[in-house]
Amino acid sequence: KKTYYPSSKNFFRVTLNHNSDSYEKIQLHIKNNDPRYIIQAISGIIYFRDKLVSEKEFLKKHNEINKNLSSSLSNLKISKAKKRVLEQDKTGNSFHFTIYYDFNDEGTEYIKLGCVMYGSEYFEKFKYIDHLRLGFNSKNFSYWLQNEAFE
């Protein structure tokens, strides 16, 4: 099933059940009306449904994946993880921890390891679940996500 973002239909996402030991879901992003269905972003997702343990479990899994990726991708520029407010949530009650493994100096093509914890108002509005995501984004998709998807 195609799902669109709140402010733009330039890309859509399809989420597939995966249920492996590593990820619950696999998410693909494709440019709308692309007759070749070229994947612009692909992510593995783990959901954390228990708010009482989310942050602790997030950080444990986040650190484990980061350790593995950092040793495998040591030639890439790797950002430091910090707890930051999720810009899309205007209440300021949603947070994310994100690390970027950049393929170029422009920061436009990268692997992204992130955890998102939603505030109660944002959760009630969109029904998004706290999650960890490991994904690769193309340059075009990255630009769209940062500048158009949540305007």
Where are these regions (language model features)?
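N-terminal leader/targeting segments
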Residues: 1-38, 150-151
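Intrinsically disordered, low-complexity segments enriched in small/polar residues
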Residues: 2-3, 9-10, 21, 35, ...
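Generic detection of intrinsically disordered/low-complexity segments and helix-coil linkers/edges
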Residues: 5-6, 17, 52, 95, ...
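Prokaryotic Sec-type signal peptides and long signal-anchor helices
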Residues: 15-16, 27, 107, 140, ...
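Long, charged/polar, surface-exposed segments that mediate recognition or autoinhibition
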Residues: 20-94
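Surface-exposed beta-strand edges and their flanking turn/coil or helix-capping segments
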Residues: 55-57, 125-130, 146-150
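A charged, solvent-exposed segment within the mature domains of Sec-exported extracytoplasmic proteins
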Residues: 60-140
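Soluble, non-transmembrane alpha-helical interaction regions
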Residues: 135-136, 144-148
